[in-house]
């Protein structure tokens, strides 16, 4: 999986190239300027907009090992085990560099300590921060990516230099990207004269996952026709437009919440990208 397999998101791809890919492909240039190879990027935005897919494609671009970390890989009921699990995951990444270490729903592991009542949760966050800082072992060659739908729940210490020092907003795909995603989703399927530009205009605010659902709904309906006819029936623009009418974009609820944080809790301008996207 590489960037060519992901429709749109060109600005985000360029950011990742500068921060992650080029340091791996041009190490001498970056070292000449004293820029370390590795570091952290936090991607946030509505669910279903390609954060996890982008992380996997990043690993594919640099031909690095991809290590995906979920909540269940870390959390343990016994005191001290969660911290040990986290340390072992970082050690695994360090021993197999170049490695992309990807934390999905990172806010679940790095929630704000101000909201915590239990000491164990604070200890895990302290361990996480120490691992990102490379206190006992160097993280050179380890690329740390985090994804979250709720960056406002993440402890602010994670955004300090050397940790997730680049925070990137992953918005719903724009018109051009939606057309590209629909082309990817219908690739290899029986189709007939599909007007992707028309479909892109009709799917404003749809996430990548929403667009996949559009194609899935259209295919399910077309399969019913094919089963009756006994032969495959090609998908048409009309089929996909009809499927669009049956679905609603799932991003609107997220933006309703994000808008409040962007307007009233935007310390340091971290959510300026949301304000710009919403044209506020």
Residue spans for each PLM region:
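C-terminal engagement/docking regions of AAA+ P-loop ATPases
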Residues: 1-37, 41, 53-54, 145, ...
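Walker A/P-loop NTP-binding motif of AAA+ ATPase domains
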Residues: 1-202, 206, 218
